[in-house]
Amino acid sequence: MQLPTNPIEMSYDYREVVMWLRKCGRKHLGKNFIIPENEKGIIFGMLAWFLQDELVAKEMNIDLTKGIMLSGPIGCGKTTLFKLMGKIPSKRKNFMMTSTRQIVSEFMQSGYEILEKYSRGSLYNDHRTPKNYCFDDLGSESASKYFGNDCNVMAEILLTRYDIFKEKGIITHLTTNLTAGEIETIYGNRLRSRMREMFNLFGYDESSWDKRR
């Protein structure tokens, strides 16, 4: 994702927002939050989505009604970026972040009620309300069985959340190291097709350096 090449109208002073983001990064990461030149477009786009800046979103072809699928190589900072976006003083920060490995682990212990928990809401809540989630590291989860029955847990959850998105506008976010082709191989063409409707696609370059080092 690239920064706009021409001057555009903005609803916020993004220089101030980025300064705040850097301070927030230092506070919560314990080190400087560095924004490489080739990643500024992603940061700018993410900020525009979370701030609901319609002017910037229009220029960058971002659909504010969709969630975000953030892809890129291992260690490029996808999870960290979503965690920092969750600190922005905006009503859009209200999402829960859960790793796909954790979800599959819960499924293997508790079974099919976990599919409901992460899609339509807990079966044991009289006021079931779907929540906004960021499913972290899609593709890292292992194949799963419950009492001998195979289940592609994340595919089932995401397909149900697609229906909820169409019905109620409930947002889902994802981070992943997978390519589009790998997503189709693991989760099927049906889900990949629906992902285009559910998500704005933000991607780090393959050359993005590992920020964990």
Residue locations for each model-derived region?
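A short, basic N-terminal segment
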Residues: 1-63, 202, 209-213
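Walker B catalytic acidic pair
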Residues: 136-138
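Active-site signature of alpha/beta-hydrolase-fold catalytic machinery across serine-
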Residues: 84
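AAA+/P-loop NTPase substrate/partner-engagement loops
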Residues: 87-133
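Walker A (P-loop) ATP-phosphate-binding motif of ABC ATPase nucleotide-binding domains
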Residues: 67
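Hydrophobic anchor at the beta1->P-loop junction of P-loop NTPases
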Residues: 70
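Conserved glycine(s) of the Walker
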Residues: 75-81
